Amino acid sequence: MGLIATLPDLEIVFVFSDINDIHTDFKPILPIMSDLSSIETAEGSSQANQINCVKTFEDLFSTPFHGDVNALCWKRELIGDFSEIVNQVELNGNMAELNQEELCELQLSRQGKLAREILLNDMKILKDHGASPILNLIKCYDRDDSYPFFPTDVYSFHVDRSPVATDTFLCTYQGEASEIIPNSQAIQKVLVPEIRDELKKLYDGAEVGFESFLTECFFDLHYQAKPNAQTINLGLGHLWKLAVDHPGSKVLPCVHRAPIEKNGQIRLMIIC
């Protein structure tokens, strides 16, 4: 369980990405945004079919993905002041990890202490179940400007991949929340003709090796939203389990991305 490996600017499992600048006129499709409450009432929709909500962590951990379901949510209404924790931590750079010792040393009000207890408990139950949770403070992620026609940073819709069976767990406590999209409403970027043509220019090798090139460079992990796609905001305080692309997986991996942060706002989230 947990992340296998990441690039500094990627929030995905086991993803590695001097490619000359390629300038194209591709324009991103802006999906429609949905929240979790609207999904629960949209019976029969692709969003509702993708998500199952559970009532306990044990259910979240033990419930298998099946059919179209590749996102499980332990929906919670959290108490406490998480912004107090964020405001007490000096962030040197765009993001930093807050370890348990540093968290416990913070001098907090009653509301801040309530928030801290939730963070400590979430980290404990994840560790107890074999995960390696990381508590991150995020001002923003680094942008990938190496190849403008195909950015591979976390703001791009992508799936996680692992050589072993695993799931991705995450929860946002403060700031903008992560987003997912139903697989039926997204297309692999490597299948978009214009993008595929540009990738072939980058590859510049024998046709027989092109598909291996896409996999080895992890271009095949990234997706583009279809017209009128409905992006689902994961909300604050809810602990999520997302399906990962791994050998033996019985469902499609969950397509997700990091949100665009609001100026001056810092995200507080756990991921593993």
Which positions does each model-derived feature cover?
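A general structural signal for short secondary-structure junctions and capping/turn motifs
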Residues: S62-H66, I125-K127, D160-P163, L170, ...
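Catalytic core of non-heme Fe(II) oxygenases with the double-stranded beta-helix
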Residues: P151-A229, G235
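Short, surface-exposed beta-edge/turn micro-motifs
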Residues: D68-A71, S132, T166-F169, L236-G237, ...
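Short, structured patches in soluble enzyme cores that scaffold and shape functional sites
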Residues: L137-K139, C171-Q174, P182, V244, ...
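Catalytic core of Fe(II)/2-oxoglutarate
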Residues: C217-C272
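Extracellular-facing segments of soluble proteins and assemblies that are Gly/Ser/Thr-biased and enriched
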Residues: L108-D160
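N-terminal auxiliary "cap/dimerization" subdomain that precedes the catalytic jelly-roll/cupin core
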Residues: G2, L7, I12-G130
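Short helix/loop capping segments that flank catalytic or ligand/cofactor-binding pockets
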Residues: S83, I180-P182, K250-V251
